Amino acid sequence: MRIGFIGLGNMAGTICQGLIKSGFIEGNEVYGYDINSQQLKMYEHDFGIHVCSSEQDVVKNCDYLVMGVKPNVVESVISKIKAVIDQQVIVSIVAGYGNDKYEELLPGSHHLTIMPNTPAKVLEGTTLFERDNTLTTEELSYVQKMFESIGEVYIIDNYQMVAGGALSGCGPAFVYMFIEALADGAVLNGLPRELAYKLASQTVLGSAKMVKETQLHP
């Protein structure tokens, strides 16, 4: 299977890196397009992906497509690729574009809306799948395995995507701030900054693992 990325910004790029790092796919099986040519060159050099000249070029070369563009341009992108979409699976990470919106824009297509998060870069991501989608059983199984290679997958009802996405999507930023605050307090009391970060990070990591494995109330 060949995976294509239409847009390789922060989140889509994180997914791309995670999939290659996990061994789920080789870099030479990945195709990408982004309006930032320097970004594309970096992925070509560092991860060995194929650089495409347009969104249509990505579609023509791939079986699975990760739609990773900004919400304000997604409809423009869809108008460009509509004529070349055949049986390719669209996995959308675009906020605000769920099953109903894709049914309106690309009726008859195979599409799934998901909400990933940045810890996917270190294979500890959380990805939410919208329950309503148009994938076949086999396609959904493949996409689930894809994202399980970079973390955990939860299939949830459509109405839960906003709250779930806010928690798992924005949550890491709050955790980073908490780690920074813990480290700042330690530095204020005499610890070197590097050691303070290590202690704070491991403390949060260990605490999270305790909650998951013991299932005790935090």
Regions found by a protein language model. Give the residues of each.
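A structural micro-motif
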Residues: 1, 28, 49, 88-89, ...
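NAD(P)+-binding Rossmann beta1-loop-alpha1 motif at the extreme N-terminus of oxidoreductases
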Residues: 1-46, 50-53, 60, 125, ...
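Hydrophobic packing within well-folded, soluble alpha/beta domains
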Residues: 3-5, 65, 91, 143
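Short, well-ordered alpha-helices that flank and scaffold nucleotide-derived cofactor binding pockets
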Residues: 13, 17-21, 45, 79, ...
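Rossmann-like NAD(P)(H) cofactor-binding subdomain of soluble oxidoreductases
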Residues: 37, 47, 55-129, 133
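Internal alpha-helical scaffold of NAD(P)-dependent oxidoreductase catalytic cores
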Residues: 101, 105-110, 126-164, 175-213
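Aromatic-residue-lined binding/catalytic grooves and analogous aromatic/hydrophobic interfacial grooves
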Residues: 171
